Amino acid sequence: MNKIESFKIDHTKLKRGIYVSRRDQIGAENVTTFDLRVKEPNNEAALDSAAAHTLEHIGATFLRNHSEYGDKIIYFGPMGCLTGFYLLLNGKYDSKDVVSLIRELFKFAADFEGDVPGASAVECGNYTLMDLSLAKTEAAKYYAEVLDGIGLDNLNYPE
């Protein structure tokens, strides 16, 4: 089998940030997949699964209701390795194009109060796997340490 593109990225050099993972053309439409790297691979503990699940619910709800990007959201969810999230947008974008959106998202998550959207047995297949407090902590950390002063090293994959 051929190695997939995401396995060709040197994860020993990968920093936390916002990266274009891939761009695909499906018919006449372009789809951009973003790698929202919240944890430094293999150097930092992965996201707790309950925190990641909570951020997925908050994030997907926020993004699909966003006034500018809501109709462009295809998918938002955690990576299997739990070091970040994938965001798929309809359109052709660069990392710098979505910095403000990702800042809004993680600020919203860090400040979130109330019931987690979709956190019921009717709405979710594993609704008890939630940790709002830890999700807020992780969102605040990513915002403060990465998004607030993001630079080119955090927007382009390492060579």
Curated annotation (Swiss-Prot):
Coiled coil ranges: none
Cofactors (names): Fe cation
EC number: 4.4.1.21
Molecular function via GO: iron ion binding; S-ribosylhomocysteine lyase activity
Annotated Fe cation binding sites: H53, H57, C124
Cofactor stoichiometry and binding remark: Binds 1 Fe cation per subunit.
Entry annotated with the keyword Ribonucleoprotein: no
Keywords: Autoinducer synthesis, Iron, Lyase, Metal-binding, Quorum sensing
Transferase found in the keyword field: no
GO biological-process terms attached to the record: quorum sensing
Catalytic activities: S-(5-deoxy-D-ribos-5-yl)-L-homocysteine = (S)-4,5-dihydroxypentane-2,3-dione + L-homocysteine
Family note: Belongs to the LuxS family.
Quaternary structure, from the entry: Homodimer.
Protein's job: Involved in the synthesis of autoinducer 2 (AI-2) which is secreted by bacteria and is used to communicate both the cell density and the metabolic potential of the environment. The regulation of gene expression in response to changes in cell density is called quorum sensing. Catalyzes the transformation of S-ribosylhomocysteine (RHC) to homocysteine (HC) and 4,5-dihydroxy-2,3-pentadione (DPD).
Protein name: S-ribosylhomocysteine lyase
Species whose genome carries this gene: Maridesulfovibrio salexigens (strain ATCC 14822 / DSM 2638 / NCIMB 8403 / VKM B-1763)
